[in-house]
Amino acid sequence: MKSKTYETHFPPLSAEQLAENRKKKVICGMSGGVDSSVSAFILQQQGYQVEGLFMKNWEEDDDTDYCTAAADLADAQAVCDKLGIKLHKINFAAEYWDNVFEHFLQEYKAGRTPNPDILCNKEIKFKAFLDYAAEDLGADYIATGHYVRRGEKDGQCQLLRGLDNNKDQSYFLYTLSKDQVAQSLFPVGEIEKPIVRAIAEDLGLATAKKKDSTGICFIGERKFKDFLARYLPAQPGEIRTVEGKVVGRHDGLMYHTLGQRKGLGIGGVKGMGEDPFYVVEKDLVNNVLVVAQGHDNSALLSSGLIASQLHWVDRQPIRQPVRCTVKTRYRQEDIPCEIQPINDETIRVVFDEPQIAVTPGQSAVFYQGEICLGGGVIETQIK
């Protein structure tokens, strides 16, 4: 199989490199999406012995309103058949429930807003999958369709941002160690998304026009509020302004996140002007959602944050202040900051300029240029 788009964007490898790659077995995680499909093809073109693996991480109910695992598996199988590679199948639903989903629920109960995709990468894709591929399938490497790159300095692997700035997924992979990065290949991290689609169309792959998945992996396209209500009982309460004025009611604190504007159900409040309301605090003790008016309200701003559950890609704790940039949510512009270590497990992060909607439970991920240093979970804001 050939792709002119591939040949345009990937220079041919030397005979020596091809010969070396042919000795290596790569298990490519096949999600049934276009990124993993093209990743498998790129690896084939680079000479590797490629096999696919489809992971089922969630036991579904009877809801058929979103893209099911069965449909994704069919797409993954169709791509593997087209490429002429074997597809393995594995069920990690028990591991997912124990190591990802239960933590997700606990965080929501505690009033925080977790990011299960980060935990899924840590516990499933780069732990359970990596271990299974190496130990049971004899893999030299695993590969995924993530938009990140591998770098190397002084013989140590580094995690780099994906070439496509709009699709870079290093934010979700900051928990990887340098050793996990060394065992992983990220073929589409070297190109931009439109090129990935063009390669898939050149090859006539079943996933060429399949839209990108959105939402949390185990919820799919369903309404988040309806899904969460099945597992956590909601506790309705008051919505108050910072000054204490009652302006509405909420269905449950867990349905709201800091900085949220839409979906609060607050109409025009007499004597309070037309500026929209934003969530600035979740008062768990009193079950009150605290709001303030105006996107530039000082109550929305933080001068920094405290983070814990730290993961550094090189696995070396930070002992001295470090200048870098940080993202406190995906696709955010880089924020210049200084990391100030409190101890090996906790850091203070001071922003150069105040930032809005710094959300406990989300991750703060740090960069120096293209290099992802690692990150941690936001514990509190610093006002």
UniProtKB/Swiss-Prot annotation:
Its main location: cytoplasm. GO terms for cellular component: cytoplasm. It is found in: Cytoplasm. It catalyses: S-sulfanyl-L-cysteinyl-[protein] + uridine(34) in tRNA + AH2 + ATP = 2-thiouridine(34) in tRNA + L-cysteinyl-[protein] + A + AMP + diphosphate + H(+). ATP binds at G29, M30, S31, G32, G33, V34, D35, S36, M55, G145. GO terms for biological process: tRNA wobble position uridine thiolation. Keywords: ATP-binding, Cytoplasm, Disulfide bond, Nucleotide-binding, RNA-binding, Transferase, tRNA processing, tRNA-binding. It comes from the Bacteria. Disulfide bonds join C120-C217. Residues 167-169, 329-330 are annotated as: Interaction with tRNA. Its EC number is 2.8.1.13. The active site is at C120, C217. Residues 115-117 are annotated as: Interaction with target base in tRNA. The record marks H146, Q362 as: Interaction with tRNA. GO terms for molecular function: ATP binding; tRNA binding; tRNA-uridine 2-sulfurtransferase activity. Belongs to the MnmA/TRMU family. Catalyzes the 2-thiolation of uridine at the wobble position (U34) of tRNA, leading to the formation of s(2)U34. NCBIfam families: PRK00143.1, trmU. This is tRNA-specific 2-thiouridylase MnmA. The gene is mnmA.
